[in-house]
């Protein structure tokens, strides 16, 4: 007997419609619909055809239910660019990442989440009063999202210094960070809460600077928009964008360093200080009033001409997960192979690798089987 919801999950993970899968598997759409709704059980021949078309281990379809991840529970970065297929692939990545996190959590004690709840700083939530001043709104009009970023910096002891590694910062405060699969190119990033645990999934095909900003953007969604009644739309995206800019380029540091009417040459040098994209720094200078509208437009044109609109010449190296690297390192010492993890999760190693920043292919396979340590003896991962 197969788990019908896993058949749906596998199909969506591959970005297929019911029609497309029925064509590949040689099964009528009506019959496939019966399989997915649990009204009928596929014959051995039909199951073999589905396994081949979807490229999942057969055991995947017999395992327990995987908790759903509805679109309304997720904050997507730049959702307007997504097709339905890309959204399905992304959400399926999130569900599988949550399964992997459960596997890790059964064997390691990870850091507890330490994200402040700053939902009262959001103007997008339905429970935020619109007729009274927002917390953090100063007489000078500092946007609440910017003030929220300042509070996060203060709580985490960051001061006004640049953030050296955005992924490590998220993980140091209990956020579970995973990577998106390569067939999810149109999704920059997304985040969600699951039973009090924050998750962020990032697209690793973007520039390192873009990924850092996406990670900060998703942190903005997590702290500003909360776990329930998550707001969506342009206003929520604008809030998370302002939060990310303020977190990575705090106003106090920008004002202390940036000249009025900064040149392109200054931007290309200073972006390395904050470890951000040149376009992001140009936008930050403008929103802080350090450049005029005309200067900002000129900067954008000049940076685009130099190749900085979609790329970051001579950019940073990509950040990766410190927690996952430590987990896999500890498993190697115990003789646990990546194939063991994939087997436990009923996945191919390639699908596992997609979730973990490519760390599977760089891990050295151990030889012996792991010992069955009780959960109470799980090693605790601590970040420096």
Regions found by a protein language model. Name each.
Residues 1-384:
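Short juxta-domain linker segments that transition from a proline/glycine-rich
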């Amino acid at each position: 007997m197969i788990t019908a919801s896993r058949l749906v999950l596998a199909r969506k993970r591959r970005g297929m419609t019911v029609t497309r899968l029925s064509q590949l598997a040689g099964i009528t759409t009506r019959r496939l619909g019966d399989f997915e709704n649990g009204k009928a059980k596929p014959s051995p021949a039909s199951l073999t055809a589905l396994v081949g078309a979807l490229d999942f281990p057969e055991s995947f379809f017999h395992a327990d239910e995987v908790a759903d991840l509805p679109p309304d529970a997720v904050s997507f970065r730049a959702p307007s660019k997504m097709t339905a297929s890309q959204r399905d692939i992304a959400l399926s990545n999130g569900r599988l990442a949550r399964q992997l996190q459960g596997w890790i959590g059964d064997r390691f004690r990870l850091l507890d989440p330490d994200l402040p709840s700053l939902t009262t700083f959001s103007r997008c939530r339905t429970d935020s009063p619109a007729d009274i001043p927002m917390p953090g709104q100063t007489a000078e009009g500092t946007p609440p999202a910017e003030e929220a970023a300042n509070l996060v910096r203060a709580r985490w002891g960051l001061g006004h210094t640049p953030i050296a590694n955005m992924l490590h910062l998220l993980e140091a405060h209990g956020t579970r960070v995973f990577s998106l699969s390569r067939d999810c190119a149109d999704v920059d990033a997304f985040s969600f809460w699951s039973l009090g645990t924050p998750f962020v999934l990032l697209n690793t095909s973007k520039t390192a600077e873009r990924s850092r900003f996406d990670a900060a953007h998703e942190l903005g969604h997590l702290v500003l928009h909360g776990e329930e009644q998550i707001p969506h739309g342009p206003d929520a995206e604008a809030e998370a964008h302002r939060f990310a800019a303020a977190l990575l380029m705090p106003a106090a540091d920008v004002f202390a360093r940036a000249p009025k009417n900064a040149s392109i040459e200054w931007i290309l040098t200073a972006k390395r200080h904050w470890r951000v994209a040149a376009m992001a720094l140009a936008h930050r200078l403008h929103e802080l009033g350090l450049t005029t509208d005309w200067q900002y437009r000129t900067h954008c044109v000049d940076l685009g001409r130099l190749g900085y609109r979609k790329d970051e010449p001579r950019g940073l190296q990509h950040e990766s997960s410190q927690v996952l690297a430590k987990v896999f390192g500890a498993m190697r010492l115990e003789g646990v192979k990546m194939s063991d993890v994939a087997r436990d999760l009923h996945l191919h190693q390639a699908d596992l690798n997609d979730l973990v920043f490519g760390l599977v292919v760089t891990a050295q396979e151990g030889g012996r089987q792991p010992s069955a340590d009780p959960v109470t003896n799980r090693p605790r991962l601590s970040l420096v």
